[in-house]
Amino acid sequence: MNTFPLFFKLEDRKVLIVGGGDVALRKADLLSRAGACITVLAPSINHEIQALLSSSKHELIYEHYNKTYMTNSRVIIAATDDERLNHQIHADATALNIPVNVVDTPHLCDFIFPAIVDRNPIVIGISSNGKAPVLARLLRARLETLIPQGYGKLAKLAGEFRGDVKAKIPTLTGRRQFWERAFEGKVSQLMFAGNENEALAQLQADLDNTAASITAKDATDDNGLSTASTSAPAIANEFTAARNTMGEVYIVGAGPGDPELLTFKALRLMQQADIVYYDALVSPQVLDLCRRDADKVFVGKKRRNHAVAQLGINELLVNSAKEGRRVVRLKGGDPFIFGRGGEEIESLRAHNIPYQVVPGITAANAAASYAGIPLTHRDHSQSVRFVTGFLKAGAPNNNFKNFLDTDETVVFYMGLHSLPRLTEGLIDAGRSAETPIAIVSNASMPNQQVLTGTLASIVELQEKNQLPTPALLIMGDVVSLHHDLAWYNLHNQQHNQNTSETDNNWLRGGTATTPKSNAQFNAHQQAHALSMITNLATEDGDLEQLIIG
């Protein structure tokens, strides 16, 4: 270790920053969060620093450097672009025995600003000793995703109880075990879920129960130190009580398949689960992020093939929670958009099972974004409607007259297998046969494919290209923007402007579309591209529709 990590108490202590530019601003921002009284010394000080340090506790001095301003400083920061001046500041601070940091000059620094993960009062500093600050920032970014914001509130709560815990639990071992149970159990779960009052009440109840179960006996060692100990049976009983409490169910949206689209909260709950019940639309990459030793149970539904009926899934969730387990119900997309999450929490509520719901990116959002098809656009669409192709008990959704607004985008979930019925019904109801429509298959995944056409042509195009499920349909004028706005997997494009025009559609960069005079595939290229398409599992659903806009 070339440097020793220390945490300075700078609240209401003077810190001198020499320099008034962007570098000084970054340091002032960090130091102000620690409560320091900051003096900025520079002939010119930018407006951002002026706004940041507008409080009367800070001081802005519009003067050239003079070492007399170092008086009473706790630390000094040299943040100028004048190398000679920075050396002088270092020499003056060293002579006064005041720690100094010369920005971006490690050999002139008595201390280094680490990359900081702030969960006040929990603070983590990461330093490369000035060797690779970018790497330190990357490590910090990784830690930011792993450490919930609730840890700060949890630490503050522990601080409030520290005295009571010490008074009621006489041994160090007993206190350590108490805090381990609190930080790994119900108290932390409540805090992370944002239920601060319930977390406080739970911690108080845990402390009272622990104190009541402790049998303490005083003893004194040869040095006269107290060695009162908690009996082993009492500690064992506490652990048993903690393990036998009611579990909790987390209804988690797994998103469209790309694991990078998971929320931080989803990832945290997945990694603390005892058992995971997952759907067919949960990608292997997402499932792999669950806790390694958690039980993983497939309860997915495919078209005309339900591994476990919904009532059976509800029962599994209830029973697992009653066993005291932390249960993750992992659902593709978002639990509340054609995901039957509402039915599951109704069942949990009926059995008084605690639960949380974590939203996910629904397939419509992912498919539109990754296909370059904005669901709304000021020039094309002022609202968006999410519709299922099938209603409850598998009945087809034939409410075509609801989908005739040309200023609205309509997204059909679970509509690929009924594509001929949908397109014919829409045209018969009065929708123009030239209305643009797209099929997006495996949205957000490396094998994503997009097929564009019109209501009149899309069935024939799909018969030729056979895009696999899972897939959804996007209908509306916004689909016409796909050709210009598509961005995903462009490195896989096979684009040939020299081939002769044909009547066939063509596949480009995972995108099959109607032919353009300036971009055609020849027959060999088309056959090669289409051979890359594989049939995946289909999907099913039985809710009606959601209108947004």
Swiss-Prot record:
Region (Precorrin-2 dehydrogenase /sirohydrochlorin ferrochelatase): 1-203
Full protein name: Siroheme synthase
SUPFAM superfamilies found in the cross-reference section: NAD(P)-binding Rossmann-fold domains, Siroheme synthase middle domains-like, Tetrapyrrole methylase
Coiled-coil segments: none
Functional pathway: Cofactor biosynthesis; adenosylcobalamin biosynthesis; precorrin-2 from uroporphyrinogen III: step 1/1; Cofactor biosynthesis; adenosylcobalamin biosynthesis; sirohydrochlorin from precorrin-2: step 1/1; Porphyrin-containing compound metabolism; siroheme biosynthesis; precorrin-2 from uroporphyrinogen III: step 1/1; Porphyrin-containing compound metabolism; siroheme biosynthesis; siroheme from sirohydrochlorin: step 1/1
Reaction(s) this enzyme catalyzes, per UniProt: uroporphyrinogen III + 2 S-adenosyl-L-methionine = precorrin-2 + 2 S-adenosyl-L-homocysteine + H(+); precorrin-2 + NAD(+) = sirohydrochlorin + NADH + 2 H(+); siroheme + 2 H(+) = sirohydrochlorin + Fe(2+)
This protein's UniProt keywords: Cobalamin biosynthesis, Lyase, Methyltransferase, Multifunctional enzyme, NAD, Oxidoreductase, Phosphoprotein, Porphyrin biosynthesis, S-adenosyl-L-methionine, Transferase
Species annotation: Psychrobacter arcticus (strain DSM 17307 / VKM B-2377 / 273-4)
GO BP annotation list: cobalamin biosynthetic process; methylation; siroheme biosynthetic process
TM ranges: none
Function of the protein: Then it catalyzes the NAD-dependent ring dehydrogenation of precorrin-2 to yield sirohydrochlorin. Finally, it catalyzes the ferrochelation of sirohydrochlorin to yield siroheme.
CDD domains tied to this protein: SUMT
Spans annotated as Uroporphyrinogen-III C-methyltransferase: 247-549
Residues bearing the modification Phosphoserine: 128
Pfam families according to UniProt: CysG_dimeriser, NAD_binding_7, Sirohm_synth_M, TP_methylase
Annotated residues for binding of NAD(+): 22-23, 43-44
InterPro entries, A to Z: 4pyrrol_Mease, 4pyrrol_Methylase_sf, 4pyrrole_Mease_sub1, 4pyrrole_Mease_sub2, CobA/CysG_C, NAD(P)-bd_dom_sf, Siro_Cobalamin_biosynth, Sirohaem_synt_dimer_dom_sf
Active-site positions on this chain: 279, 301
EC number(s) stated in the UniProt entry for this protein: 2.1.1.107, 1.3.1.76, 4.99.1.4
